[in-house]
A protein has these predicted regions:
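N-terminal capping/small domains of soluble enzymes
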Residues: 2-113, 352, 356, 364
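A mid-to-C-terminal "edge-of-domain" accessory segment
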Residues: 2-46, 281-412
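Hydrophobic faces of well-ordered beta-strands that scaffold small-molecule active sites
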Residues: 42-45, 76-80, 103-109, 127-129, ...
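Active-site beta-loop-alpha junctions enriched in small/polar residues
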Residues: 48, 83-85, 108-112, 132-134, ...
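Alpha/beta enzyme core
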Residues: 52-77, 98, 113-226, 244-249
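Generic secondary-structure signature for well-ordered alpha-helical cores
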Residues: 71-76, 98-101, 159-166, 189-197, ...
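Active-site loop-helix segments enriched in His/Asp/Glu that coordinate
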Residues: 85-107, 112-123, 144-149, 179-187, ...
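Catalytic alpha/beta core domains of metabolic enzymes, predominantly
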Residues: 205-208, 212-335
Length: 412
């Protein structure tokens, strides 16, 4: 049936995913064309963008812990910080360089020679050279900078960074609000000709749509030989969708942060982009079973807690509360799980509350090492439902509480 709309390339990927126990919608692979992804497919910015989250300040030791975990996941490129911002930032980047991680380290800089000098002196492999491009920034932040002056400034500073032998990522802040497409193309081409190794398209205010990002990436890509990276903010809740639309349009790298930490609503989440790239495009370079613990580590260090229903790494993502769902998933997990929980370093959870059923209670008992009859399970369920109906209870039963109910019933 699938061969009616899934082409040969899509069939191969779908079969590969099925062998891994991943059963996504086959319609994902209709007219499938594999995107051109870079060796630096994920460029994690937790240590730079993430620290711009209001109230979040990482110590040097915090950053080393996060970087070590990112490296264990297999993230190929880490944006280590903004070394020109302070002495502490500089020392942190230097300490990260001294770790000799497998990941390539980049550091952020403005289009200022003194910023570029600090990045070069830090020992970082690469530089994210930022120069805001939209008319709002050129008019108000740069006091009426003309397009001609912008291009001259850009060429001068890319060339200066290139003289240090740095891997250069030109980051055009507020790309998506520059309404002169010809000027945008000219800026990226100028950066490429001056020595940039990658072009970063930036949705600084998270105001673009997937269609808008895809169009922009395609148009800019027509002019360039160098790869494109996208940095998508989440103000409209579209950072993940915009990033994936950009990948399908030709972007080869996605800028992310763990738990989406960053300015305002943050950016695309590392722990969501990685499994999405795997389950939609077959990217297999990451240790995905480390992603839940990565998310938990950054929650602990940052103090920013994620909701339990957070996709892929939340506490409830592999939890089943409804009796209908519990029965289905216990008969065959594929009924209500399209990927195995272990893939994300998680375990299946069965919650017992007023929506639960006998099969869930039997499962919880078995997990406790107790074999119970259907009749005992039915009586436990009656007690559970009665406690919710009376208003006595408003939270799920823990396994220990279920054991206590079983003991009470079996004593009778």
């Amino acid at each position: 049936m699938e061969d009616q709309y899934v082409n040969e390339q899509g069939q191969k990927l779908l079969e590969k995913l099925k062998r891994e126990g991943i059963l996504p919608s086959p319609y994902n692979f209709a007219n499938y064309k594999a995107p051109s992804l870079d060796e630096y497919i994920v460029h994690d910015s937790t240590l730079r963008e993430g620290e711009q989250t209001p109230g979040v300040i990482f110590s040097i030791d915090d950053k080393l812990k996060i970087a070590r975990k990112l490296d264990a996941v297999g993230v190929p490129q880490i944006e280590a910080g903004f070394p020109a911002a302070s002495e502490k930032q500089r020392k942190c980047v230097e300490a990260l360089v001294d770790m000799n991680l497998d990941a390539q380290l980049s550091a952020f800089a403005r289009a200022k020679k003194e910023d570029i000098d600090v990045v070069a002196d830090s020992g970082a492999d690469g530089i994210v050279l930022s120069l805001s491009i939209s008319p709002y920034h050129r008019e108000y932040k740069f006091k009426g900078m003309s397009k001609e002056t912008y291009l001259e400034t850009l060429e001068e500073h890319i060339s200066y960074a290139e003289s240090y032998g740095l891997y250069i990522i030109y980051s055009a802040e507020d790309t998506t609000r520059e309404n002169d497409l010809d000027f945008l193309k000219k800026a990226y081409k100028t950066a490429e000709e001056a020595g940039a190794d990658r072009a970063r398209v930036v949705d600084t205010l998270g105001c673009a749509s997937p269609n808008g990002m895809a169009y922009l990436v395609k148009e800019i890509g027509k002019e360039l030989e160098i790869p494109i990276e996208v940095h998508c903010h989440n103000d409209l809740g579209l950072a993940l969708a915009n990033s994936l639309a950009s990948v399908e349009a030709g972007a080869s790298t996605v800028s992310t942060s763990v738990n989406g930490l960053g300015e305002r609503a943050g950016i695309a989440m590392t722990e969501e982009i990685i499994p999405a790239l795997h389950m939609l495009y077959g990217t297999s370079i990451f240790e995905m079973n480390q992603l839940t613990s990565l998310s938990n580590l950054v929650q602990e260090i940052s103090g920013i807690r994620m909701p339990p229903h957070k996709p892929l790494t939340g506490d409830n993502v592999n939890a089943h509360s409804s009796g209908i769902h519990q029965h289905g998933v216990l008969v065959n997990p594929t009924t209500y799980e399209f990927y195995p929980p272990r893939m994300m370093g998680q375990k299946r959870k069965i919650y017992i509350d007023e929506l639960g059923g006998r099969h869930g209670i039997i499962y919880v008992a078995k997990e406790l090492g107790i074999e119970i009859s259907d009749e005992t399970a039915r009586k436990v369920l009656e007690k559970v439902k009665a406690s919710f109906s009376s208003g006595e209870r408003r939270s799920s039963y823990t396994p220990d509480e279920i054991k206590q109910l079983i003991d009470e019933i079996e004593k009778c």
